[in-house]
A protein has these predicted regions:
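C-terminal, well-structured catalytic/ligand-binding subdomain of enzymes
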Residues: 51-102, 107-108, 118-142, 175-434
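Sec/Tat signal peptide C-region and signal peptidase I cleavage site
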Residues: 43-49
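Bacterial N-terminal signal peptides
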Residues: 33-43
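Bacterial N-terminal signal peptides that target proteins for export
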Residues: 20-33
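Proteins synthesized as precursors that undergo proteolytic processing into mature forms
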Residues: 128-172, 177
Length: 434
């Protein structure tokens, strides 16, 4: 532990300088993007409107912790990258436009079974003119994934960063020892919430959007999305329903707005009763969503290599959930492809969403209109309805392979490659029919 503290402290000094230098052009880009968004939209919009949760193994059916995030960003085209880290290798979600030039990651898991994600918080720090809000968040995830093995080591990592750290985020963490926690982090400190402690998590989970409980009251953003995530998880945790497939279907593809008391799947917003269009406001998946990932951890004593990243690149209602493990055996479907300047699955999902879901482009501010009829309809041939049976089949096949590996105690690299190839073949066959 002493070596980790010293090493992390020394690295953090140069790390902060690197963040300032590397982020200069990125800061300008983000400022221009925010200005454009403010001009184009006639109503309030959220930037980086992520939704997340950390789930204790105490309330999952198999006793394994879960880490869920749905990521919203200006960088919608993503891929998954395998990185040989300083201490631990890891697989993480990255921006295809600027990785590896910028050593930033947004959610991932490493060879020790340590997994980390973040949501941008907007009520922890008074950002000064010229500062980029949370400019260090992605860099910190990258560094922590290559240095940390446990929740406790992540605490020490945060403790030893040079201050101000330029972090403003809610970080969700799980590890191979059963650890599961949420950290609300600002420039000078953090508040930790333990998902295994009933005082912090009476229902066995902790959800966050874009505000922090330790921050200023009723400031930040994402309160309506929080209502939906928290309410859905609360009921499911009492019935041991929370699995990766359940999370992607009930959360990453939720079209409920609890403030409006709207659930688009009730059919009332479909033809012929309605137009089949709705405004994309405060649903968990959004037109700015780039991916949703659920990391399924291991039980204490299990091989950390069995930690599984259930990965959906792109807009969740038009994407497919596939499994990944920390290995250099990265399947082409989620890796960077120069033809698309992103992963094929990311490009496919985003393109489908732009063409058929957010398809109305007539003047400024129209990108918020959601063609719900194209996603889900009473005839049962909406995009989401057609993709989900294929996804369920891929999930069952992957679960069967994972069960064998858990029984043998480790992943089989040959089987892993065969599984990836089988999944890719089924996806390609299905998409060709569309």
């Amino acid at each position: 532990m002493v070596n980790l503290l010293i090493e992390t402290h020394n690295l953090s000094k140069t790390e902060t300088l690197t963040i300032h230098t590397a982020s200069f052009m990125k800061t300008i880009t983000h400022l221009l993007a925010l200005l454009a968004a403010a001009v184009c939209l006639s109503f309030a919009a959220e930037t980086w409107a992520c939704t997340s949760a950390v789930i204790s193994g105490k309330v999952t059916p198999d006793g394994r912790p879960l880490l869920w995030n749905i990521r919203d960003t200006d960088f919608r085209l993503n891929h998954m990258a395998y990185v040989k880290g300083q201490r631990y290798d890891f697989v993480a979600n990255v921006n295809s436009a600027n990785f590896p030039a910028l050593k930033e990651a947004w959610m991932g898991s490493n060879s020790a079974g340590f997994a980390l994600m973040n949501t941008q918080s907007y009520n922890l720090v008074e950002v000064k003119p010229g500062e980029e809000r949370g400019e260090a968040n992605g860099r910190i995830i990258y560094r922590a994934l290559e240095l940390c093995a446990t929740v406790q080591e992540f605490c020490h990592f945060l403790d030893t960063l040079q201050k101000p750290s330029y972090i403003e985020a809610n970080f969700g963490v799980i590890d191979a020892q059963g650890g599961a926690a949420m950290f609300e982090v600002d420039y000078y400190g953090y508040t930790m919430y333990d998902a295994n402690n009933p005082k912090d998590a009476p229902y066995g989970y902790i959800a966050r959007t874009n505000f922090s409980f330790a921050g200023k009251v009723n400031q930040g953003s994402g309160y309506v999305r929080y209502m939906e995530a928290d309410g859905t998880l609360m009921q499911a945790s009492a019935m041991s329903q929370i699995t990766p497939l359940w999370m992607v279907n009930r959360l990453s593809r939720s079209f409920c707005n609890r403030l409006l008391q709207v659930d688009l799947r009730d059919g009332c917003h479909n033809q012929p009763e309605a137009s089949g269009w709705f405004v994309d406001q405060d649903f968990i998946p959004r037109n700015s969503t780039s991916c949703s990932i659920i990391v399924q951890g291991v039980k204490p004593g299990e091989n950390p290599a069995l930690t599984t990243l259930w990965t959906l690149l792109g807009y969740p209602p038009t994407g497919l959930l596939v499994p990944l493990w920390v290995s250099d055996n990265m399947p082409p479907m989620v890796a960077y492809d120069a033809r698309f300047k992103a992963a094929p699955l990311s490009h496919q999902s985003i393109s489908m969403a732009d063409r058929q879901v957010f398809a109305y482009h007539q003047g400024m501010g129209t990108g918020k209109y959601l063609h719900w009829e194209a996603l889900w309809n009473r005839q049962g041939n909406g995009l989401m309805q057609q993709l989900q049976p294929l996804e369920a089949e891929l999930y069952r096949q992957s679960e069967a392979t994972l069960t064998r590996w858990r029984q043998s105690g480790k992943p089989d690299q040959k089987e892993m490659k065969q599984l990836y190839e089988a999944i890719e073949a089924k996806i390609q066959e299905s998409l060709l029919r569309w």
